[in-house]
Design a protein with these regions (language model features):
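Subtilisin-like peptidase catalytic core
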Residues: 1-39, 89
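Extracellular S/T/G-rich loop segment that most often corresponds to the catalytic His/Ser-adjacent loop
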Residues: 14, 80-180, 184
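Structural recognition of the beta-strand scaffold that forms the well-ordered cores
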Residues: 26-31, 53-56, 61-65, 86-89, ...
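Glycine-rich, charge-decorated loop segments at or immediately adjacent to ligand/cofactor-binding or catalytic sites
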Residues: 68-84
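Long, low-complexity serine/threonine/glycine- and acidic-rich segments characteristic of extracellular
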Residues: 247-359, 370
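Alpha-helical transmembrane segments
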Residues: 373-387
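Cytoplasmic C-terminal tails of single-pass
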Residues: 385-420
Length: 420
C-alpha cells in the first residue's frame, strides 16, 4: 500500500538528471495477489484494489496479473479485482509464432470477479485482456555471481537471460510494455483511453460469456489477446487527429463484418453500437478524411438506455469510389464525446471521388448506392423485452424531406422501423 501510494505521490516528480519528458511515473506493472479472506474472492472493495483505482484516476495506467488459480478459481484476489485497472490473464502460444493456435493457459485465473452489488455488471468483467505468459524467457535478475540475491542498486549491465517461467506475472509485464509503446507514440493518452484501446484492438478469443452484458467479453480471455501493433497504430491515430481527451470510452461502436454483397454488388459493412453508461446519439462516417456525414433518426418511447444495442449497416457502391485505397472511418457520438474510431480500407472500381463531399454529389436521382440502416437490437442486459425502442425515419415522405432540407444527409436513402 505504501509503495503504491509513493508511486501516486510521485506521478509528476521531476527526476534529477533526466529530460522533462521522462519525469513522473506513467505505468504500474503489478504481479502481486492479495488474499481477500472472502468466499468467491474480492469484489474490488478491498483496500488494495481501491488504491489501484486511485492510481488509474490519477493518470497512472495499471497492468495487474489476474492470478494463477486456473479455471475453477474461487474468484479473483485483491488488486486483480480493481474496478478500473487492466487485469491481465495469460495465454499459451504452444511454442509457435502463429496466434491461431494460442489457447488460454491452464493456470490463468478466470473471471468474472465477485459482484460488488453496485448494479453495474461491467466492473465484474475481469480479466480485461490476455497476453503470452507461458514458457517465457526471463531477464537475469542477479547482480552478483553465485546466489541470486537481487541487490538493489547493483550493476546489472552485464546480466543476460536465465531460465523460462510461466504465469500471469509474465503476461502483465508484456501488457505494460505495450502500454509504454502507446505512450511513446502518443504521450497525451489518458489511462482510460489506453485501457479502452487495448480492449478495442485485442484479437477476440472464445465465445461471449455474458452476451447480455457485453457481446465480446469471455471469462478466459477477457476482450481478447492483446495486439501491440493495432494498439500503437490506434494511439497514433488519436494523436494525429487531436482526439486525446475527447474519447468517451463508454460509447461502443464495433464492426462485425465487411464484404461485397453478391446480389447487389455493394460493399457492406455491418456492426453494432451501444452506450455502456448512456445512449449513443448518432453514428457518423466519412470517406478519406472528408466531411462527417450524420444519420437522422427519431426515437420512440424515449431514449435508449445503457447497454441497449442496435445494429447498423453501411453499403457502398464501389463503382462510385476511386480505384485507390479509400479510408472509411466510422464513429459513434454521445453527450460526453465520441467512440474510438473504426477505419476500414476499401478499393473502388473507378470513380473519381476522394472525399465524402464528392461522394455525395455523385448521387444520381432515384439511385440507391448508399444505404445506412439503423435497427434497434433487443439485447437488453436487464432482460427488458416489452416495447423495444427504435430508431427510424417514419416514411418515404420524411426521407425526401430530410434529403431536401439537409444535403449532409443526402446519402441516407432509406431506413426502416423494425418491430420486435
Amino acid at each position: 500500500m505504501n509503495g503504491i501510494q509513493w508511486i501516486i505521490d510521485n506521478k509528476d516528480t521531476a527526476w534529477a538528471g533526466v529530460d522533462e519528458s521522462l519525469h513522473g511515473i506513467d505505468i504500474i506493472s503489478l504481479s502481486w495477489g492479495i488474499t481477500s479472506h472472502e468466499g468467491g474472492g474480492s469484489d474490488g472493495s478491498d483496500m488494495h484494489s481501491m488504491i489501484l483505482d486511485v492510481a488509474m484516476e490519477e493518470g497512472i495506467v495499471v497492468s495487474v496479473a489476474a492470478g494463477n488459480d486456473g479455471p475453477n478459481n474461487d474468484g479473483l484476489s485483491g488488486m486483480g479485482s480493481s474496478d478500473l485497472s487492466i487485469t491481465v490473464g495469460a495465454t499459451d502460444d504452444g511454442n509457435t509464432i502463429t496466434r491461431d493456435d494460442d489457447t488460454i493457459a491452464s493456470y490463468s485465473s478466470r473471471g468474472p470477479r465477485r459482484d460488488n452489488g453496485d448494479g453495474n455488471p461491467l466492473n465484474e468483467l475481469k480479466p480485461e485482456v490476455t497476453a503470452p505468459g507461458t514458457n517465457i524467457i526471463q531477464a537475469e535478475g542477479c547482480v552478483t555471481s553465485g546466489g541470486c540475491n537481487n541487490l538493489l542498486g547493483g550493476d546489472a549491465s552485464s546480466n543476460t537471460y536465465t531460465s523460462r517461467g510461466s504465469g500471469t506475472s509474465y503476461a502483465a509485464p508484456a501488457v505494460s510494455g505495450i502500454l509504454a509503446l502507446m505512450i511513446e507514440a502518443n504521450p497525451n493518452l489518458t489511462a482510460f483511453e489506453m485501457k479502452e484501446i487495448l480492449k478495442f484492438t485485442a484479437e477476440r478469443k472464445g465465445e461471449p460469456t455474458q452476451p447480455d452484458v457485453d457481446p465480446f467479453w469471455n471469462r478466459d480471455f477477457g476482450w481478447g489477446l492483446v495486439d501491440a501493433y493495432e494498439a500503437v497504430k490506434l494511439s497514433i491515430k488519436l494523436r494525429d487527429q487531436g482526439l486525446n481527451g475527447l474519447i468517451d470510452v463508454n460509447t461502443q461502436v464495433h464492426v462485425e463484418s465487411s464484404s461485397i454483397d453478391n446480389q447487389s454488388g455493394l460493399y457492406v459493412i455491418q456492426g453494432i453500437a451501444w452506450g455502456q453508461m448512456g445512449s449513443v446519439n448518432a453514428i457518423e462516417y466519412r470517406i478519406n478524411d472528408g466531411e462527417w456525414m450524420s444519420v437522422a433518426f427519431e426515437q420512440t418511447n424515449g431514449s435508449l438506455s445503457a447497454l441497449e444495442r442496435f445494429s447498423w449497416s453501411l453499403a457502398l457502391d464501389l463503382d462510385k469510389i476511386s480505384m485507390a485505397n479509400n479510408s472509411i472511418e466510422i464513429r459513434g457520438l454521445s453527450d460526453d464525446g465520441q467512440s474510438l474510431p473504426i477505419t476500414i480500407t476499401i478499393q473502388g472500381y473507378g470513380g473519381v471521388s476522394d472525399s465524402s463531399e464528392s461522394f455525395i454529389w455523385d448521387l444520381l436521382p432515384n439511385t440507391m448506392f448508399f444505404v445506412l440502416f439503423i435497427i434497434v437490437g433487443l439485447l437488453l442486459w436487464n432482460s427488458r423485452t416489452e416495447n423495444p425502442e427504435a430508431l427510424f425515419l417514419d416514411s418515404n415522405d420524411s426521407i425526401a424531406k430530410v434529403l431536401k432540407e439537409d444535403k449532409d444527409l443526402a446519402s441516407v436513402v432509406d431506413a426502416e422501423l423494425l418491430e420486435g
